Swiss-Prot record:
Principal cellular location given in the protein's record: cytoplasm
CDD domains (alphabetical): SufS_like
Organism whose genome encodes this protein: Yersinia pestis bv. Antiqua (strain Angola)
SUPFAM superfamilies given in the database record: PLP-dependent transferases (SSF53383)
The protein's role, per its UniProt record: Cysteine desulfurases mobilize the sulfur from L-cysteine to yield L-alanine, an essential step in sulfur metabolism for biosynthesis of a variety of sulfur-containing biomolecules. Component of the suf operon, which is activated and required under specific conditions such as oxidative stress and iron limitation. Acts as a potent selenocysteine lyase in vitro, that mobilizes selenium from L-selenocysteine. Selenocysteine lyase activity is however unsure in vivo.
Upper classification of the organism: Bacteria, Pseudomonadati, Pseudomonadota, Gammaproteobacteria, Enterobacterales
Gene responsible for this protein: sufS
HAMAP family: SufS_aminotrans_5
NCBIfam families assigned to the protein according to its UniProt record, in alphabetical order: PRK09295.1, sufS
Protein name as it appears in the record: Cysteine desulfurase
Active-site residues from the entry: C364 (cysteine persulfide intermediate)
Amino acid sequence: MNFPIERVRADFPLLSRQVNGQPLVYLDSAASAQKPQAVIDKELHFYRDGYAAVHRGIHSLSAEAIQQMEAVRTQVADFIHAASAEEIIFVRGTTEAINLVANSYGRHFLAAGDSIIITEMEHHANIVPWQMLAQDLGVEIRVWPLTATGELEITALAALIDDTTRLLAVTQVSNVLGTVNPIKDIVAQAKAAGLVVLVDGAQAVMHQPVDVQALGCDFYVFSGHKLYGPSGIGILYGKSALLQQMPPWEGGGAMIKTVSLTQGTTFADAPWRFEAGSPNTAGIMGLGAAIDYVTELGLLPIQQYEQSLMHYALAQLSQIKSLTLYGPTERAGVIAFNLGQHHAYDVGSFLDQYGIAIRTGHHCAMPLMAFYQVPSMCRASLALYNTREDVDRLVAGLQRIEKLLG
């Protein structure tokens, strides 16, 4: 495989630092990925050489910023193969995107007695907004169960759908197990029953090409900071026909057509009616640079490289006798495990002393922890800049902990 890993690693400045006297092994990209120099430079350039407020500015700096921001909207649409740039809404992240759909689409189209389907593997961001909506409106939440291998029980979906079911919210890739759900087939089954489908792509867009039109989903959400972009910027894709029917969730500047103290307010068309206030313009620029970066490398080569590395990692980790691996054999991005009876926090703390960064805890997936009957897990996540040497360091660290703690 000719993936240019040495060049890629050189593009990420933070990877060259040491932690606790050891060269850093960063295995926490599923929480937040490191940033290539191109993204850092793009934000710096905007702040240093081109900063201005967008919306309604007639001076050159403002006009340039508006043009650049809207160019990124088009770039995002191309990246996920949306039909139009007007189907792309800038938000703070995946969490805000889901809350926007729950509070705009949900409160406008759902009513007491309706039902929503979520899955047992969802991140809290794709659970809690629906629970809040259900509590307020009297909507029922139905849970799509998992198999013992951490995959959706595909045959169970049909039994969850009836005449009251309106919406399915499902992750494309589990943030804990790495399970890659067959989204196209799931969406087809849901749409045949008349459901609206939201797909959480937060753990997918950095690992594989995404085509929202081919998937057929109504909404697709993801965050920039997991895609090697800045924090505080994310994307909500929505089919234009739906967005134009949805009321705004937040009010303020930039999302209006007219405001009158006597006649009330009229709202801008989508997507702008969902972008109240001053946007994170620098973050938008940085997201554009991040998309440029992964596009230049190619998502298919990235996917092939990461899958090869994942197979190697699973093979090496499976040799540690006291280690329990969670999730299916075929997965993307993440490896969840526990070492013997040791608490995940203890394992993570020891690894940190060895310069190895992983994530520990419930990973914003308490229902999944309950499914496996554990309070927490360790999670190592792989990105385009990780190597077999990183995996070997992790394995050696775990073997060292196994000897120390027994």
